[in-house]
Amino acid sequence: MSRKKSNGGLRFQPAGGNRATQIPVGKKQRLLIERVAGDGRGIAFIEGRTWFVSGALGGEEVEARVLGARGKVVEARLERVFQASPERREAPCRHYARCGGCNLQHLPHDGQLALKQRLLAEQLQRVAGVQPEEWAAPLCGPEFGYRRRARVAVRWDVKQRQLDVGFRAEASQDIVAIDDCPVLVQPLQAIMRHLPTVLRSLSKPQTLGHVELFSGTAEAVLVRHVAALPAEDLARLEAFCREAGAQLWLQGEGDPAPVDAAQRLGFALEPWGMELAWRPGDFVQVNAQVNTLMIQQALAWLAPQAHERVLDLFCGLGNFALPLARQAREVVAVEGVQAMVERAEANAHGNNVYNARFFQADLSQPLAGAEWVAEGFSAVLLDPPRDGAYEVVQGIARLGAKRLVYVSCNPATLARDTQVLVGQGYRLKRAGILDMFPQTAHVEAMALFEAG
């Protein structure tokens, strides 16, 4: 199907040659929203097309403006509510109407949790044909002030000769000017309030790529630049970070590095008295409170005993592996990136953990042949990326594990992998959502499988 522009809108030419009715960008349409989709958008049906409307709730009568269309699918943004859902609330953030960072602030937190629970249950039923024997209560932290890392968009506007600083608009490369964000942790909110002014004051702002903010055992500002920073601009950034009590990191063509080579970043796992080192670019859960609850629940569900060996797949920096090692006889932890394996090993030694072994392996391939596979395990923990762990779970039963905890950031791939595990004789004993990203439709979940 080819796509053509016409009169500021979109025109589609089906392969058969019959021209589809034009749906111009910007067109407004009155709609009745039937339900909410998995990505948090309202769904409506009219004239043979499916409309996805961001900002709309089930049962509402709304007016929506077209953002784009393709075939029988139209993407739109809420413009006006004629008949509101009783669940609707005024979004707490003043930037919500334009910023693309959050998409569920118009729904109270209890409603967000119910939506995510429903989406997980629907995926498990539709794809795997199962429901858990028991639903666990959602794991929740604060609905605002939770995010400990953020990427700030920066772009030099050649025509206006000004620096745009903020977050991306929904479904757009436009930058919404923002100097406050209520989902950030308080230390990052304080930095964000002054960051745009500082960046715009630089003598060569066009050298900037983007900026990342981090909060853990210390705060950090990472400035990515496409050309060398003038000395005066570097001095200005250093002064800003000193005043904010934050580290300054820079990244040009190489890896990120602190301006002060002695500085380090880390995050605490307080219940276990641990501190894990990490660097900008490493994966780390953005929600510290829910991360702690998640680890505690995973350990409770796996219940590793002092004589047991546990396998941790997609181990990252050791977020699960190190607490697991406090309870199990031995933990074998596997990660796909060698640099992460080395940092996880360093984290283990830095926390006096010596019963965890770390290996690099391509976990997009079947496990057969790896040196650690033949050793056998009592329990397995998986924390894969959005693609899931399809190749890994194909042979998971051969490891001999009686208990398996699967931490998922994508209900669709969790459901797909659940079907495989059930086919190998595992029961879906328990499942529940992890509210890692309040105010968004992003669903994280944990599932416990037991053999037999």
From Swiss-Prot:
GO biological process: one example: rRNA base methylation
Annotated stretches, region: Disordered: 1-23
Binding residues for S-adenosyl-L-methionine: 285, 314, 319, 335, 362, 383
EC nos: 2.1.1.190
Keywords per UniProt: 4Fe-4S, Iron, Iron-sulfur, Metal-binding, Methyltransferase, rRNA processing, S-adenosyl-L-methionine, Transferase
Ranges where the TRAM domain occurs: 22-80
Pfam family name, one: tRNA_U5-meth_tr
Claim: Transcription regulation is one of the keywords in the record: no
Gene Ontology MF: a single term: RNA binding
List of residues binding [4Fe-4S] cluster: 93, 99, 102, 181
EC main group: transferase
Transmembrane as UniProt keyword: no
Reaction equation(s) it catalyzes: uridine(1939) in 23S rRNA + S-adenosyl-L-methionine = 5-methyluridine(1939) in 23S rRNA + S-adenosyl-L-homocysteine + H(+)
Gene3D superfamilies: 2.40.50.1070, Nucleic acid-binding proteins, Vaccinia Virus protein VP39
PANTHER family to which the protein is assigned, alphabetical: 23S RRNA (URACIL(1939)-C(5))-METHYLTRANSFERASE RLMD (PTHR11061:SF49), RNA M5U METHYLTRANSFERASE (PTHR11061)
Function, in words: Catalyzes the formation of 5-methyl-uridine at position 1939 (m5U1939) in 23S rRNA.
Name listed for the protein in its UniProt record: 23S rRNA (uracil(1939)-C(5))-methyltransferase RlmD
Gene: rlmD
